[in-house]
From Swiss-Prot:
Gene3D superfamilies: YVTN repeat-like/Quinoprotein amine dehydrogenase (2.130.10.10). GO terms for biological process: alternative mRNA splicing, via spliceosome; maintenance of gastrointestinal epithelium; negative regulation of transcription by RNA polymerase II; negative regulation of transforming growth factor beta receptor signaling pathway; neuron differentiation; spliceosomal snRNP assembly. The keyword Repeat applies. It is found in: Cytoplasm; Nucleus. It comes from Homo sapiens. Pfam families: WD40. InterPro entries: G-protein_beta_WD-40_rep, WD40/YVTN_repeat-like_dom_sf, WD40_repeat_dom_sf, WD40_rpt. The SMN complex catalyzes the assembly of small nuclear ribonucleoproteins (snRNPs), the building blocks of the spliceosome, and thereby plays an important role in the splicing of cellular pre-mRNAs. Most spliceosomal snRNPs contain a common set of Sm proteins SNRPB, SNRPD1, SNRPD2, SNRPD3, SNRPE, SNRPF and SNRPG that assemble in a heptameric protein ring on the Sm site of the small nuclear RNA to form the core snRNP (Sm core). This is Serine-threonine kinase receptor-associated protein.
Length: 350
């Protein structure tokens, strides 16, 4: 019996959602952070989308956001020329890292001791979070603003992307190992530690490269311009979203398009699989995040599979929420929660 994809809609942001990231799996589940042009990154329970808190302090659009592995710290990159590190449990601001231009990307090392940043000033910076007064190490070499920067290979190397170039750096020597040039703008990068795979999107292309050597593995072509793509943790599927408001799901091994569907009311800017692979999240120009099931119909999070009577002739549809909660009621709850904030709302530091 056919099942219909019914996403969970996470409201609360008032401007386009431009970045999102999941934590690792913790004793309390896993968590999701979103970056938005409204300047108010939000933290949510990863498997349900339930709002937990809003980090207040930035004075401009937030372009990048990430969580460390155990979800105890968050980091954000913003148009106010700062990156900030937060206590993800209390919501308190821990430090503000001043930059000379707009900051677009942040990433923690596995031990959470260092933070990598990149932005419009074309420099990669590495901050020792145990020495907040120390000057960061700087890596130069990009010729345009940096869109994404990621630690890889157990933090021994760094991957970074500017407009049309992806570069691989050695952390110890701070030197470039290799670079890839593209004939159009790189829109996103994702690093998969298991297998050392780098996912790159540009134009309508979704390309997979070795994160160690940058050698090509395979590539797929989508029907529309793609802004972001994510590979399933078990490398069975990949999902991608872009300018046509659609999400596409592909078989990673064959490249076959398995399904495509709309849900957002604007271009999709970011998409990521959860760490357990049970769902993926998307963020859009329409100001919402949506959570989608990898396997439609499975009881998971707020999805409860409810099958109609066999003789009804209806499509089976996964019911969202607890048995007594309607989809409309969940939307109302999300709207009410959108005005809530962490009890601590730190002021921006100079």
């Amino acid at each position: 019996m056919a099942m219909r994809q019914t996403p969970l809609t996470c409201s609360g942001h008032t401007r386009p959602v431009v970045d999102l990231a999941f934590s690792g799996i913790t004793p309390y589940g896993y968590f999701l952070i979103s970056a938005c042009k409204d300047g108010k990154p939000m933290l949510r329970q990863g498997d349900t989308g339930d709002w937990i808190g809003t980090f207040l302090g930035h004075k401009g659009a937030v372009w990048g956001a990430t969580l460390n592995k155990d979800a105890t710290k968050a980091a954000t990159a913003a148009a106010d020329f700062t990156a900030k590190v937060w206590d993800a449990v209390s919501g308190d601001e821990l430090m503000t890292l001043a930059h000379k231009h707009i900051v677009k990307t942040v990433d923690f090392t596995q031990d959470s001791n260092y933070l990598l940043t990149g932005g419009q000033d074309k420099l990669l910076r590495i901050y020792d979070l145990n020495k907040p007064e120390a000057e960061p190490k700087e890596i130069s070499g990009h010729t345009s603003g940096i869109k994404k920067a990621l630690w890889c290979s157990e933090d021994k190397q760094i991957l970074s992307a500017d407009d049309k170039t992806v570069r691989l750096w050695d952390h110890a020597t701070m030197t470039e190992v290799k670079s890839l040039n593209f004939n159009m703008s790189v829109s996103s990068m994702e690093y998969i530690p298991e297998g050392e795979i780098l996912v790159i999107t540009y134009g309508r292309s979704i390309a997979f490269h070795s994160a160690v050597s940058l050698d090509p593995i395979k590539s797929f072509e989508a029907p529309a311009t793609i802004n972001s793509a994510s590979l399933h943790p078990e490398k069975e599927f990949l999902v991608a979203g872009g300018e046509d408001f659609k999400l596409y799901k592909y078989d990673y091994n064959s490249g076959e398009e398995l399904e495509s569907y709309k849900g957002h009311f604007g271009p999709i800017h970011c998409v990521r699989f959860s760490p357990d692979g049970e769902l993926y999240a998307s963020g859009s120009e329409d100001g919402t995040l949506r959570l989608w099931q990898t396997v439609v119909g499975k009881t998971y999070g707020l999805w409860k599979c409810v099958l109609p009577e066999e003789d009804s002739g209806e499509l089976a549809k996964p019911k969202i929420g607890f048995p007594e909660t309607t989809e409309e009621e969940l939307e109302e709850i999300a709207s009410e929660n959108s005005d809530c904030i962490f009890p601590s709302a730190p002021d921006v530091k100079a």
